[in-house]
Amino acid sequence: MSSSIRASRQRAAAAVVLTAVLAGCAGSAPAAQTAQSPGPAAASESGRAAESASLIRPGERHFSEVRQLTFEGNNAEAYFSSDGTRLIFQRQVDTESDCDQQYIINVDGTGLHRVSNGQGRTSCGYFYDDDRRIVYSSTHEHAPSCPAPPDHSQGYVWPLGHFEIYTANTDGTDLRQLTDNGAYNAEATLSPDGKRLIFTSTRNGDIELYTMNVDGSDVRRVTKRVGYDGGAFFSPDGSRIVWRAGYPETAADTADYQRLLAGRLVRPSRMEIWVANADGSEPRQVTDMGGANFAPFFHPDGERIVFASNHENPRGRNFDLYLIGVDGNGLERITYDDDFDAFPMFSPDGKRLVWASNRNAASPGETNIFIADWVE
């Protein structure tokens, strides 16, 4: 592979990380809103799931029967429905939208259709209410066009855009706004009992985790340490949470963090994985690896965490998947591709893993959704 192509793919991988983890979600009094159905999007890959041993790299012993579900554009953050039959994910394809939108697809690759309204940028889709509704974040209330890219003269930074959290039926109808405070409200996921959302917000001047009821009421702050807390998920029994965190370690780090935050930016180059009780008590650091460790998700056994990391080359964009015990022991590398693998999620029964990867791209920089049968 030429250096120019590799550089292009690495830049695209960075762009996926940038857009995929940014979303909108916050909680105060819910504001109801009704929108027209976006209707299904024509998708050339619908029903074309690829299955091949060539999708498995040497060393990927936990994977069997890997299937590629999308075949163009940038696709990321695919999350299972509670019955394991569907996925919701964000997708940006030039022929369909200038910005990431939310799509649903069956796990066999059929039935791809858009469920967001096609405006603004969306992120962090999740099923709830027995898979009859979805929750996701969007910037469309602030502006229907794509948000401007961040100021990279500041280095590699993520923008903390004007995202709010919404719910809708799985066909995109009955859109309801849950948050409305002008802050960054995003990265929302659901408790196993379906009653609480956990999300990231800047509403109180820092980037913290909060929970709220699924109707937007009873907002409670979960984290209180200065720094970036985000991308949280509940454990299978709902008693714990796992998230990524980047905490300033020096006075200079804190000053840089606060300066960027004032401009609605954050630098994600150093993040580690943390766990705590669901109310935020007894927080504990799981990883101490350096680099960017993010996108953690509990294994269904509740004792292990899968996540993405570039700790073997912190200045690079080659992220791989890793598995680690909640006690910080037993680190194991899962993927061995030479580009980008991230955003892993286990199916509810633990038999499948879905993730986003640059592997098998038809053109440089494509990121697609893959699903594998999981082998212990």
Q: Which ranges hold each PLM region?
A:
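A flexible loop/linker signature enriched in serine peptidases of the S9 family
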Residues: 71-74, 90-102, 117-122, 137-164, ...
